């Protein structure tokens, strides 16, 4: 398996130069603020060979009916006690080595009064009751995901989605996610499979809705796909260009778990946590050819990099996931800049990291007639100390108490049972500098009840 190297500084593109400060808060979240600065020096690794890009085309394409015309989901025979678990597990599992380094940015004081203004509007969105009403069961985890455009709010959860206007009026839905791909050439996309993501592309005035496929988990002869729908206009209730991109690498059918999406100037970027049928594990990084997709070109291309998680020199650098940058605001990233992708590493986890850090990767892609692409580790930024692996028992995830809640089945998902930052990685270009903001769950003090 090919491995990584740092991209040389004489490449004909501009780097995003980043200085990071990590703000860890008492609610078990860490806000990571990154501003432009001269680059930190990457720690040396044993590998200097480049990761190999794999280019391919969409395996299927068509245009959907108008979303507003899709029928609402039909209610099936309900079982109030049934809870569908969507938690495919694979790959290594980060284990805590105890509360060692602590929270180096723990805040001991809080403002005397709230400093955030009251919301302008509050309305009910989707819930697990919508799953119950459509499928006859509830789903865990719900994986809520939403995006705001100029005139709409689109929300997706496992396994339904809906469109609202800015006043909170329901315009379409709730609809089961698979209905968006009804009669598509890849039948697996028509199943409501889970892990949906919705993005609004403010540069193109388009909506992106997605999900993965899961039928290959029960049939090792079947591959997996990222199912991606791009609205044909700025109206999220209209028609969509539908695409399917296969995730197979080196003949291995990789399941693209935990997909996270980002928007850039000429690419849509996906990062996934991938595992194969036996011990195969790694992080998938994809770029999709944006200009062809928004114009409904069936020959839209993709490129994939696979970072091998079974390589002990690479595992500390990627842990359980990377996040692609996703811009906020109207100012585009600078022309020909690499796309920043961020991961975290924790020296108190069991993946071999020797210090706490943010790992900054650069993804570069040119969609020429013969495309070129590269992915490499730009730098590692040391952070204040943190522990990201909670001592969660008896479950692996749902163990964070809530005020007034005594039923342990209603405790919160800690979101840090693995070593990874959490969606999104918000990018903003302020013209004079650029910034990136994301989150990392941490154990603020020993024990879950104090996190």
Regions found by a protein language model. Name each.
Residues 32-46:
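Signal peptide processing junction and immediate N-terminal pro/mature segment
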Residues 1-16:
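N-terminal secretory signal peptides that target proteins for export/translocation
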């Amino acid at each position: 398996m090919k491995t990584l190297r740092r991209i040389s500084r004489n490449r004909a593109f501009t780097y995003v130069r980043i200085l990071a400060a990590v703000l860890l808060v008492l609610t078990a979240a860490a806000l990571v603020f990154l501003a432009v600065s001269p680059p930190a020096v990457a720690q040396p690794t044993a590998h200097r060979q480049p990761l190999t890009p794999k280019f391919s085309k969409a395996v299927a394409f068509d245009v959907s009916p108008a979303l507003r015309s899709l029928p609402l989901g039909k209610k099936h025979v309900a079982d109030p006690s049934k809870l569908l678990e969507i938690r495919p597990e694979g790959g290594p599992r980060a284990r805590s080595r105890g509360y060692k380094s602590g929270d180096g940015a723990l805040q001991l004081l809080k403002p005397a009064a709230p400093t955030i203004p009251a919301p302008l509007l509050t309305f009910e969105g989707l819930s697990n009751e919508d799953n119950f009403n459509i499928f006859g069961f509830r789903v865990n985890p719900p994986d809520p995901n939403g995006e705001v455009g100029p005139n709409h709010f689109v929300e997706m959860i496992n396994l339904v989605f809906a469109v609202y206007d800015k006043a909170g009026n329901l315009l379409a839905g709730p609809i089961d996610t698979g209905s968006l791909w009804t009669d598509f050439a890849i039948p697996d996309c028509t199943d409501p499979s889970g892990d949906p993501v919705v993005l609004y592309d403010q540069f193109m005035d388009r909506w992106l809705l997605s999900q993965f496929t899961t039928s290959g988990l029960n049939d090792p002869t079947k591959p997996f796909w990222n199912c991606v729908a791009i609205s044909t206009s700025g109206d999220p209730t209209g028609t969509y260009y539908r695409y399917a991109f296969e995730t197979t690498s080196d003949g291995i059918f990789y399941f693209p778990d935990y997909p996270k999406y980002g928007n850039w100037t000429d690419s849509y970027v996906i990062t996934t946590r991938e595992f194969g049928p036996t011990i195969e594990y790694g992080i998938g990084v994809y770029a999709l050819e944006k200009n062809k997709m928004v114009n409904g070109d069936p020959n839209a291309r993709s490129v994939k990099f696979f970072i091998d998680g079974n390589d002990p020199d690479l595992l500390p650098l990627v842990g359980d996931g990377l996040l692609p940058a996703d811009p906020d605001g109207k100012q585009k990233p600078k022309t020909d800049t690499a796309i920043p992708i961020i991961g975290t590493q924790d020296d108190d986890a069991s993946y071999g990291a020797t210090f706490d850090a943010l790992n900054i990767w650069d993804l570069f892609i040119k969609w020429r007639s013969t495309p070129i692409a590269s992915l490499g580790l730009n730098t590692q930024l040391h952070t204040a100390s943190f522990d990201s692996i909670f001592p969660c028992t008896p479950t692996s995830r749902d163990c964070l108490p809530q005020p007034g809640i005594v039923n342990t089945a209603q405790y919160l998902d800690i979101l840090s049972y693995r070593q990874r930052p959490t969606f999104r990685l918000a990018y903003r270009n302020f013209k004079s500098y650029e910034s990136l903001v994301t989150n990392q769950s941490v154990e603020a003090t020993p024990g879950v009840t104090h996190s």
